[in-house]
Amino acid sequence: MGPITFQASRSVLAIVVLLPLVIVRRRARTKRIKANDRNVQTYSFRTTVKGGLLCGLMLCSASILQQIGITGTDVGKSGFITAMYIVLVPVLSFFISRKASVRVWVSVAIAVTGLYFLCVSGGSLAGITKYDLMLVACAFLFSLQIILIDCFAKKVDGVELSLGQFITTTVISVILMFV
């Protein structure tokens, strides 16, 4: 099974698990609305679809790059590079007017230094492979996905957003399987 087929299979499984949960939650929300429960939060279908598409595109792209990237580099290196999304989130958030503490910036510097020592051998950039670059792109896209989720989480139902992400991921992955 190739990386894209694996991604498609994983996404289909997520849909199978999430779809019944979304149906049950929607029915419960509808009953509460009909009972005039003022504490029921309603969500825009359009915003949910938009969030599912954008977050799903990031999730699919990042996951496929990760699946391909891990085939060409060692486990420790791939794990460290992929986990760089943890420090990339505050860096990218900075560009949308979210401030990070000094501790975060020190952590970013340490992580980037670690990335340098893992990927660069003998002071030459020749040690960086295309698989390493795929994993860096993967970390960047996972960071964008997290930032997008943060933006949409306040506006939509989280379970429905997850379902939308996996539907998007499945559609893209299935198309790519046959390309």
Regions found by a protein language model. Give the residues of each.
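Transmembrane alpha-helical segments that form core, pore/gating elements
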Residues: 3-4, 14-18, 89-90, 125-179
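Hydrophobic/aromatic residues within transmembrane alpha-helices
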Residues: 6, 10, 69, 74, ...
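C-terminal transmembrane-helix exit sites in multi-pass transporters
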Residues: 17, 21-22, 85-106
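Hydrophobic transmembrane alpha-helices of multi-pass small-molecule transport proteins
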Residues: 18, 100-121, 138-142, 172-173
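Hydrophobic alpha-helical transmembrane segments of multi-pass membrane transport proteins
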Residues: 21, 50-72, 92, 116-117, ...
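Specific transmembrane alpha-helical segments of multi-pass solute transporters/efflux pumps
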Residues: 25-82, 117
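Loop-to-transmembrane alpha-helix entry segments
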Residues: 50, 79-82, 97-117, 128-132
